[in-house]
């Protein structure tokens, strides 16, 4: 039979008794544990979370912790903006307990209120912080960049010193009005479904002016066709 850890030198002493009592008190206090998502409701931003650190009995048997329901999921935000992640069952993260009962504060939408119960440091008043320990791929060219990307790196926004780079198989922009202040280079085909209006400067194709001031050779009055632009 496995026995709980003990310090033989302290057994029977007053210091040993205090240490045992203090340890028992700490074992009943929740703080933070690695955890996984059992289920998630995006409308309420609440999840069922299962801590991953198991308990061990004095007989050496591993005992899994019960899942904790109705846990708010952390979303980074402020000033009218936030970042949302599509939380899924099996996602890894951290379950962090609050110091006091926060149920009334959440019921009031984040307004100041008193603790509803005398609960202290329990996962009943916790939040879940999503995290990624592994499974992601970072391109070597982005080793020194701030990166927001999919786990496999197929879609990636990287912020480097002096430039920003977006890599994606497809980019869709739904914007009624778009303004570019500066030069634009298109390396590839371009299709325009609609009118095209150009003001100022010149318009060239293969080095030849095709704008409003361009000229043609071989022009004669009458019904003949003009030549190519010159």
Predicted regions and their residues:
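Low-complexity, small-hydrophobic/phenylalanine-enriched stretches
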Residues: 148, 155-159, 163-180, 184-186, ...
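Hydrophobic packing positions characteristic
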Residues: 2-170, 174
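Short, low-complexity, Pro/Ser/Thr/Gly-rich segments in the mature regions of secreted, periplasmic
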Residues: 223-229
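Residue-level signal for pocket-adjacent positions within structured domains
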Residues: 66-68, 198, 223
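Conserved GTPase G-domain signal focused on the G5
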Residues: 15-18, 180, 193, 229
């Amino acid at each position: 039979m496995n026995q709980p850890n003990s310090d033989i030198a302290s057994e029977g002493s007053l210091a040993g008794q205090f240490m045992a009592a203090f340890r028992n008190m700490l074992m009943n206090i929740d703080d933070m544990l690695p955890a996984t998502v059992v289920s998630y409701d995006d409308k309420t931003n609440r999840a069922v979370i299962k801590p991953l650190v198991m308990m061990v009995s004095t007989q050496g048997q591993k005992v899994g912790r019960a899942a904790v329901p109705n846990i708010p999921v952390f979303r980074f935000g402020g000033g009218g903006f936030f970042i949302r992640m599509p939380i899924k069952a099996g996602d890894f993260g951290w379950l962090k307990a609050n110091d006091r009962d926060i149920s009334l504060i959440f019921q009031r939408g984040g307004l100041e209120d008193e603790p509803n119960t005398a609960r202290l440091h329990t996962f009943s008043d916790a939040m879940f912080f999503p995290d990624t320990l592994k499974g992601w791929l970072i391109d070597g060219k982005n080793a020194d960049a701030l990166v927001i990307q999919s786990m496999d790196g197929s879609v990636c926004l990287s912020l480097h010193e002096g430039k920003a780079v977006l890599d994606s198989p497809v980019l869709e922009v739904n914007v009624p009005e778009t303004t570019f202040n500066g030069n634009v280079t298109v390396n590839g085909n371009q299709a325009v479904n609609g009118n095209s209006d150009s003001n100022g400067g010149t318009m060239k194709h293969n080095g030849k002016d095709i704008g409003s001031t361009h000229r043609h050779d071989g022009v004669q009055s009458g019904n003949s066709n003009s030549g190519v632009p010159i």
